[in-house]
Amino acid sequence: MKVSELKRLLKSYGCYEIASGKEHDVWYSPQNGARVRIPRHQSREVPNGTLKSILKQVGIQ
């Protein structure tokens, strides 16, 4: 899954961006109050371990 697709998925679950950094953006999940860092490389694939970790932190998986 690409970073842009991940961000689209997070938005569909009600998550939103709360901060932008040089290499990562910070997103907030209102479902459980979690904050996760998302890499800013829009066209790159997110590594499977990173993707699973992000989805677990926001309560999607």
Per-region residue spans from a language model:
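Basic nucleic-acid-binding interfaces
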Residues: K2-S20, Y28-Q61
